[in-house]
Amino acid sequence: MTPADLAELLKATAAAVLTEHDLDVAALPATVTVERPRNPEHGDYATNLALQLGKKVGVNPRELAGWLATALTAADGIAVAEVAGPGFVNLRIEASAQGVIITNVLAAEGSYGSSDQYAGRNVNLEFVSANPTGPIHIGGTRWAAVGDALGRLLATQGAAVTREYYFNDHGAQIDRFVNSLIASAKGEPTPEDGYAGDYIVDIAQQVIAKAPDVLGLPEDQQRETFRAIGVDLMFTHIKQSLHDFGTDFDVYTHEDSMHTSGRVDQAITQLREAGSIYEKDGAVWLRTTDFGDDKDRVVIKSDGNAAYIAGDLAYYLDKRKRGFDLCIYMLGADHHGYIARLKAAAAALGDDPDTVEVLIGQMVNLVRDGQPVRMSKRAGTVITLDDLVEAIGVDAARYALIRSSVDTPIDIDLELWSSASNENPVYYVQYAHARLCALARNAADLGVSVNTDHLDLLTHEKEGALIRNLGEFPRVLKTAASLREPHRVCRYLEDLAGDYHRFYDSCRVLPQGDEEPGDLHSARLALCRATRQVIANGLAILGVSAPERM
């Protein structure tokens, strides 16, 4: 009996109880849920349905809970149903009824946990989108991990996900980048507002290697040469770093194309026709206050140049024209103001503001022995993606960055995350998977095979706890996807690995000595294979490897 099966049984039982006592069945909520109690002594599952219904139907919740418990006790698969507190019902499931969770996992394999809750949704997920003026910094690295995991997570729930990188190659930061390259090429000091680091020297030298006469060109041609080649080299490095990190994108959109293609002008024309644009002090303004922003925003500045929001407007309109019904933006901690701005832009263009979601990520710090780490010479004072991967590896870096809610600043302890110990969360989970793979190899050597015909033999409390946790995986994925919180998958995997290690320490899976393989061995091996599958599925969502040996 899965949690979903139990919830359906509870709803049907509650409807029958209400009918029997001439009470309003319409009071039942559309969705009934069961939860796992924090204290295992309180049962396998619990429900507060009687507390939800009592006031609505005019019955004391504890009395109503008693009626539910009596009816549930008579149902197939329910071992015990007891009333607790003011109206909770605690439930214990018969061992024979829990085996379906194992068979479901083994049947679904890599798709176990998937659902169709977002079937038909066309999602554009834009993340990282770092300026092409330097390597990916640690904040962008967090988005590279979290964004990729969120894309994988939404896909398991039926969404069609397009991962997109908005290439910010338009604006003053590109001018400063070009100035820095030219200064380096000429052997001059870095401009006051320029970019420093070994990477600037490297790129400047590569530009000269590709265009040996560049320093002899007229200034405008010289700048354009450094711009075109330098930006391309930097972006090539960024894409390679992200690829090596396990994060790839389906679409790369250039901000500059929004302006050169006329799409900014098209967006402004559409907004003008809608009455959302006005002119004041020689500038063109968008009435974002009409849609919840704290002030109207300049779209075209008084000098005739487009403000940054102009590109955002054109870019959002471009996404909608490509058929996306949900546009998720993942932005840095200094972009809180963009939430109202982007939603207002969507509303001004005639869309529901809820077609735009903005996730704001907080800062990441690296520490060693409790002290902040400054490690990048190549990027000046910035800690980069490449630095982090070099220090702790791709798997640990991704897991460490995904493991906490994005709205929480995090400190990554380099010694902890590079250690082969149970205190290292990614090692703890991966070791459980490797241990399960080793168990499967040993089982094959001993002639023990998986058999699901005798899962009713799995009556040990540690077996039950592990089975029920396997049953939680679909619900964890649904919740994590709906809340846009892939860190929930990390926490679940750590909890599941703990249940497995406790099961393994308490329940002998394979025969020893002259003992012949039996039905219990085969049933426990089936449980182990199901556990291995769920851990592998979870790690795949995170973009973290599931090693077979460690």
Swiss-Prot record:
InterPro entries with a match to the protein in the record: aa-tRNA-synth_I_CS (IPR001412), Arg-tRNA-ligase (IPR001278), Arg-tRNA-synth_N (IPR005148), Arg-tRNA-synth_N_sf (IPR036695), ArgRS_core (IPR035684), DALR_anticod-bd (IPR008909), Rossmann-like_a/b/a_fold (IPR014729), tRNAsynth_Ia_anticodon-bd (IPR009080)
Pfam families per UniProt: Arg_tRNA_synt_N, DALR_1, tRNA-synt_1d
Assigned EC number: 6.1.1.19
Group of enzyme by EC: ligase
Cystine pairings recorded for this chain: none
Keyword line: Aminoacyl-tRNA synthetase, ATP-binding, Cytoplasm, Ligase, Nucleotide-binding, Protein biosynthesis
Location(s), subcellular: Cytoplasm
Motif, 'HIGH' region: chain positions: 130-140
CDD domains, alphabetized: Anticodon_Ia_Arg, ArgRS_core
Any one biological process term the GO annotation gives: arginyl-tRNA aminoacylation
Principal cellular location given in the protein's record: cytoplasm
SUPFAM superfamilies xref list: Anticodon-binding domain of a subclass of class I aminoacyl-tRNA synthetases, Arginyl-tRNA synthetase (ArgRS), N-terminal 'additional' domain, Nucleotidylyl transferase
Any single Gene Ontology cellular-component annotation: cytoplasm
Gene Ontology molecular function: arginine-tRNA ligase activity; ATP binding
Origin: domain of life: Bacteria
Ranges in a coiled coil: none
PANTHER family per UniProt: ARGININE--TRNA LIGASE, CYTOPLASMIC, ARGINYL-TRNA SYNTHETASE
HAMAP family in alphabetical order: Arg_tRNA_synth
NCBIfam families documented for this protein: argS
Name of the featured protein: Arginine--tRNA ligase
Originating species: Mycolicibacterium smegmatis (strain ATCC 700084 / mc(2)155)
Taxonomic classification: Bacteria, Bacillati, Actinomycetota, Actinomycetes, Mycobacteriales
Gene name of this polypeptide: argS
